[in-house]
Amino acid sequence: MEQLTTLPRPGDPGAMEPWALPTWHSWTPGRGGEPSSAAPSIADTPPAALQLQELRSEESSKPKGDGSSRPVGGTDPEGAEACLPSLGQQASSSGPACQRPEDEEVEAFLKAKLNMSFGDRPNLELLRALGELRQRCAILKEENQMLRKSSFPETEEKVRRLKRKNAELAVIAKRLEERARKLQETNLRVVSAPLPRPGTSLELCRKALARQRARDLSETASALLAKDKQIAALQRECRELQARLTLVGKEGPQWLHVRDFDRLLRESQREVLRLQRQIALRNQRETLPLPPSWPPGPALQARAGAPAPGAPGEATPQEDADNLPVILGEPEKEQRVQQLESELSKKRKKCESLEQEARKKQRRCEELELQLRQAQNENARLVEENSRLSGRATEKEQVEWENAELRGQLLGVTQERDSALRKSQGLQSKLESLEQVLKHMREVAQRRQQLEVEHEQARLSLREKQEEVRRLQQAQAEAQREHEGAVQLLESTLDSMQARVRELEEQCRSQTEQFSLLAQELQAFRLHPGPLDLLTSALDCGSLGDCPPPPCCCSIPQPCRGSGPKDLDLPPGSPGRCTPKSSEPAPATLTGVPRRTAKKAESLSNSSHSESIHNSPKSCPTPEVDTASEVEELEADSVSLLPAAPEGSRGGARIQVFLARYSYNPFEGPNENPEAELPLTAGEYIYIYGNMDEDGFFEGELMDGRRGLVPSNFVERVSDDDLLTSLPPELADLSHSSGPELSFLSVGGGGSSSGGQSSVGRSQPRPEEEDAGDELSLSPSPEGLGEPPAVPYPRRLVVLKQLAHSVVLAWEPPPEQVELHGFHICVNGELRQALGPGAPPKAVLENLDLWAGPLHISVQALTSRGSSDPLRCCLAVGARAGVVPSQLRVHRLTATSAEITWVPGNSNLAHAIYLNGEECPPASPSTYWATFCHLRPGTPYQAQVEAQLPPQGPWEPGWERLEQRAATLQFTTLPAGPPDAPLDVQIEPGPSPGILIISWLPVTIDAAGTSNGVRVTGYAIYADGQKIMEVASPTAGSVLVELSQLQLLQVCREVVVRTMSPHGESADSIPAPITPALAPASLPARVSCPSPHPSPEARAPLASASPGPGDPSSPLQHPAPLGTQEPPGAPPASPSREMAKGSHEDPPAPCSQEEAGAAVLGTSEERTASTSTLGEKDPGPAAPSLAKQEAEWTAGEACPASSSTQGARAQQAPNTEMCQGGDPGSGLRPRAEKEDTAELGVHLVNSLVDHGRNSDLSDIQEEEEEEEEEEEEELGSRTCSFQKQVAGNSIRENGAKSQPDPFCETDSDEEILEQILELPLQQFCSKKLFSIPEEEEEEEEDEEEEKSGAGCSSRDPGPPEPALLGLGCDSGQPRRPGQCPLSPESSRAGDCLEDMPGLVGGSSRRRGGGSPEKPPSRRRPPDPREHCSRLLSNNGPQASGRLGPTRERGGLPVIEGPRTGLEASGRGRLGPSRRCSRGRALEPGLASCLSPKCLEISIEYDSEDEQEAGSGGISITSSCYPGDGEAWGTATVGRPRGPPKANSGPKPYPRLPAWEKGEPERRGRSATGRAKEPLSRATETGEARGQDGSGRRGPQKRGVRVLRPSTAELVPARSPSETLAYQHLPVRIFVALFDYDPVSMSPNPDAGEEELPFREGQILKVFGDKDADGFYQGEGGGRTGYIPCNMVAEVAVDSPAGRQQLLQRGYLSPDILLEGSGNGPFVYSTAHTTGPPPKPRRSKKAESEGPAQPCPGPPKLVPSADLKAPHSMVAAFDYNPQESSPNMDVEAELPFRAGDVITVFGGMDDDGFYYGELNGQRGLVPSNFLEGPGPEAGGLDREPRTPQAESQRTRRRRVQC
């Protein structure tokens, strides 16, 4: 039965019953309606089959019987595979054996039937049935054989494979068993061993066992899977066999049905079993005797055949069975059958039991396998844990060993430490005793030295004071004489100048006639070219008289048509080169050729003088100048002609030079058309045409010729003075030009020369242009470097015809609408032909040597703007001429950029630019330069310029043969670093005595902050090679040298500044000499007056030009007569002023008022005006004639001149005023008066050298500040101040528009000014662009206010002005720093005034930013970030004398910008406080706003030491912009110098009205970081500070008296609306720490009525807590009122009785106050009663301190020698700068310990630091860490300081990054 398939393994799902076999597919349908998946089944008759097998196994001894006798269930351990071969063998063996015996049996039955005569019928029937069965069996056997032959080999092969796999699995199982055994043995050993502590080894073992178990399981699973796959494959084959068998069955006999076949099969099986039984019985009865009737043959044969070993297994039984019925009887047969059946049943039972046992064993085997796996896993885990525990045990042993070793070491170290401690204690005790002795000795020695020095100082101060009184008397008398002389001189000068005007007008007319004749001749020459070319050239350049050909560089625009050749600097052989050198191309293009009207005639008529003027600076370094009278005449001539400028033929847009402050990429911006805008690079110069449009954009042009829109907030105007001051010396003589020339250069009706200076200024970046004699010295970028207004040039120059020696040219005229005066045709730079106006654009050039080589032909257009660039329209002709560019060279090379230029072979072609093979943007036609940016330092590059032919093919003859069209150039960028050195280093007197201002022009940095490829970090200042200071700001422009550094500078000769970077410092800048005038000027008791007499060379340019306000030759950039109100659109006309060098080089000498006035023009204005020009920004079309202004000024002057020159200068500076006694004259204030009458309190001028860096917002603060001071001076019965003359631009009376303050001019952003003024409360803005950090902006603004010029009285606080001395000096008059150092006497005199009721009681004038005085036009809205308000009160030491009644202008309840306490609202002498206010403009308070580049002054106090040293109590607190997280800082205040208990206390905070509290309060941080003290609310909010409830600004008092520095904060401004309803609140006891008089000390307007006065030590009763403004409601002396919280301290009383006793006592002695807490029945609590003071911060920016403090008594002289007096002080706390100092330069500070005696030199500086010495080392010492007698020890006004007061004083410094 080959069709049988293997059964599933026992226990598997789907396992079949042990007896069930697969059914036949063809006969029996499978369960579920689908064909059965098994072979034909004989499950219905399993017993018969089993009996047959059993019988056969019993009867046969062959091994195959064993296999067949097994149950079909497949309980064989080998699996079901073993069953198949057994069954197959059984079928194969039984099949053939059954056929022959059955045939024989049939025959035997037939024979028996015959013999027995049919006696046994049942047997016959059986035999018959048996025969049928045999036949059927034979048929089935044949079919089985056929099936076996077809499928058995394949099945047998698979079975063999499965057996092999079984064997392999068995081997694997044996291996696993062996491994498990080994693991168990190992596990037993591990378990028996002592278990260490669990450790990492156990985990490792577990992991290893887990990995091994996973591998084993994966192997077993893969094996089982493979076996299952094989079983599945066999099952599929069986199904296929079933299908085949089905087909075969269908082809079998049709009569055999399935059921019949099954039934017959069962019957046959039963019959076979029965026959087998019979055979078995026959075999058992073999030994029985046979009947005689039986033939012996068959029986013998049966018996013989039965045991035959080789016979088939069933042959003998079959024969016996055939004979059995004959031998046995029927009963026996039945008995035998029963016996066989019973045996069969037994066998069946036994088989079933065996099957059950097999199943049990199989299950047992599976369980054992599972246990084996579990045991293996457990073993692996145990092994892993064992290894981990072993590792832990090892580690434990190691740790225990190390612990033991460490214990031993610890014991030894402990013993050593104990011994060292004992030694240290002993040494410490000895050291302390020695320190006490040393301390005592030092104190004695220092005290002796101090007394000696004080004695010497007193003698010196007395001598100086006597000398000063004498000088003042002399100066007053001399000023009177000079005033009278000046008036006479001015009158005579006016007459002479008017005569000169008439003469010049006549000359002008004659020149006009001559010019017309020359023009006719020129037209004739033009019609006859050729041999007449040279004559034409001579006529053009010489006969016309306007422009004699200069032999050298001429960068002045030529005012004639023939001036073109001189305008461009070209190499020989290049087109357009007409002169050997020309520094810059045609500055005439700035404003066009001079007017062809009276202007031209005028310049022509004055030919002799004009020729000398037109000579280049190199050709005439010392131009002849007529006498002073002639100078005045020329000035008058220019004055009379200048107003006609706007109406003339100057059609070009006004041009201005701007500097890009930041980089700008239009495509990253928000605008819709970025292509219309220009990309900017920081530090790049831009030429601006016209005014700003409504969107805040200018129309500008870059130096490379690109034009477009320029955002106004990214650029900053370059003042004309900056341009001229940056020129080489030989170029500075450009101001020698006559009036017509300068009007030609000027950009506005006022004659500002920004245009000309722009061209000049651009010459400096290209110094190589003048040195390139054989190379191309290009004119700058088109319309950018040399031609700012872009002179239109011809286009498309072509050769119409070329002959042997001549060419015919044609071109297109300039497409722009411009007045053409003709064309110049040049060959190799030589003028060959000139065409007049109206001539056709064609020319014939003859006598050309075309075969000698290429000739460069260029065509220039002569327009009303000047001559065009010859390289814009040029062509190469002749032999070897091509389109390849020539003379390719590097024009400008830096570390990160390079500019190349070339001479185009044909200007009609565009040129492709390649850098290192990479294509760059091409150069358009008529462009001959390219700039490469963002290069790498020190990197070689190869630049290639290739002429691009037109795409449509050659359009010139011969171009198809061109081979070379490119020129190549190799260059290497400069190595990175060091950075460039700063420029224009200058030293000036500082804002207060003892301070110098060192200023410089910062290096230009790009957007990344780098210069020359390295990042700029700051600047270092060196004095004679020794570094004295560093400024950590890359944009710093000045620094104040403090007292300690000043001592070094007094012996130095020069100062240099270096730029710092991570790659080192730059080279030294040009040294700035320390003139003898500076050192005395910086001392408080000395007055030095540089001689005001300029040399004739210095005065010559002054008289020879009529510059505009921006011209450096203008003495005052903003002057306007006191009564002159200029129309809003008119730029302020400024008369000439001296060149910068005029007075700088003058030696110091005593001088008269007139001389001093001239010196003011030469020095003060020279710096202040040159760096902060005001009028040049006003784009008004016209200005009142200078002649008219001159008349007005002359009428307003009363100063006679001592000489014609001085008179001329006085006339040129009519805005200045003379101070003579108490006369309110409006003349020039002489320098002598400034310096000699020091007590007049004139504000010092702080020239701002780095003005170019600053933004254009400061003119607001300066204008308003000046205006404010003017009105104060007016109301104080003072003389007309310089402020009021400056107020020609700034006074806003009668509603007239005031012009920007010239000294505060912020270049050309006047529009910004006015727009800012439109904003409410934004009157005071800094000059900084506010995209830089606010701290830096504030610092820069400080410096700017120190240096930006005299126009801002609040910015340049001078010494206190004694209004009652009869000297008519106005404190508003600006002064140069140091020109008028304050003498102590004068300062005291001014100080005393503030205590006078008439002066103190007055209400301050109020003027608001919302006043209609400011024109609300032409101002771009400022960036909110750009408004940094400087809350500087004008109460600086120099402003102290500004007293007297003040009024509110126009009665308008206007709001002033943020101010400090005294300016905000009241009489308090508060130090200027700097605040960054949101949306607010800066208020300039003090020129002492320190150098922005240095550190910002955050000193929240001053000390009495400083006060007495003459460095008044002005302190500046800066806080950041409100949004930056910093609160609005509080201004600290200096302590006044007065008798003890008089004015020695700090002033209270200014409190704000309630309406100001709408903005959330920003509690500023004092330097100590204590937030519990309220800030100055006047400076915290974004609203106006210091205004009372009605919106008016509180009275502003300029008193010298400032708050005590230790207060650290201002008195908060009180809200008047608050009531006194505090009686119900709990009562607290406070003690007054300082004297307080609200009337004189409080900034609040109603202080005398609502605030409570008290004395130091007075007991005060306080109700409740302080209000939001920092005021308590209290009671004292029988009065109730407000008490400032920062001037009192609470007293902690133990009992109510003690409190009552204290109230009755009403006073505490100073000793108790000094003792602090714990020494009495009560203690008073203040901030920081114990512990060291806060970390001191130093600010390197020196604040301007008042030279003296007010004192009710006679002033006390503080000589300069006192600054150096040594003193002894004791350290109260330990101080280590490395740990405790917040400052960056900790190496400059001294470390010390508590108890150290430190020798202090001089007074405390503005940062709160002394310069001291300890143990031979010198450095800075924080004053709040010291105690004991200071420099002012012994002074009556010294206020005892408590530790609490000390702890409140801190220093704060912010370094700009």
Swiss-Prot record:
Keyword Mitochondrion carried by entry: yes
Keyword terms: Cytoplasm, Disease variant, Dystonia, Intellectual disability, Mitochondrion, Repeat, SH3 domain
Tissue note: Predominantly expressed in brain, pituitary gland and thymus in adults. In adult brain, highest expression found in temporal lobe and the putamen, followed by amygdala, caudate nucleus, cerebral cortex, occipital and frontal lobe. A high expression level is also observed in fetal tissues like brain, heart, kidney and thymus.
Keyword Repeat carried by entry: yes
Domain Fibronectin type-III: from-to ranges: 791-882, 884-976, 981-1081
Pfam family, one: SH3_9
Residue segments, region Disordered: 1-103, 284-321, 565-629, 729-789, 1083-1311, 1330-1479, 1501-1601, 1723-1761, 1823-1857
Biased composition (Polar residues): 87-96, 1201-1218, 1278-1292
Start-end of Basic and acidic residues biased regions: 55-67, 1138-1147, 1420-1429, 1554-1586
Residue span, SH3 domain: 653-720, 1625-1693, 1764-1831
Molecular function terms from GO: benzodiazepine receptor binding; voltage-gated calcium channel activity involved in regulation of presynaptic cytosolic calcium levels
Gene3D superfamilies per UniProt: Immunoglobulins (2.60.40.10), SH3 Domains (2.30.30.40)
Pro residues composition-biased segments: 289-298
Main localization, broad class: cytoplasm
UniProt subunit comment: Interacts with RIMS1 and RIMS2. Interacts with TSPO. Interacts with CACNA1A.
Domain notes: The SH3 and proline-rich domain is required for the interaction with TSPO and the second SH3 domain mediates binding to a proline-rich motif in RIMS1 and RIMS2.
Biological function: Required for synaptic transmission regulation. It probably controls the recruitement of voltage-gated calcium channels to the presynaptic membrane, and modulates neurotransmitter release.
Similarity-based family: Belongs to the RIMBP family.
Protein name: Peripheral-type benzodiazepine receptor-associated protein 1
Record organism: Homo sapiens
Lineage: Eukaryota, Metazoa, Chordata, Craniata, Vertebrata
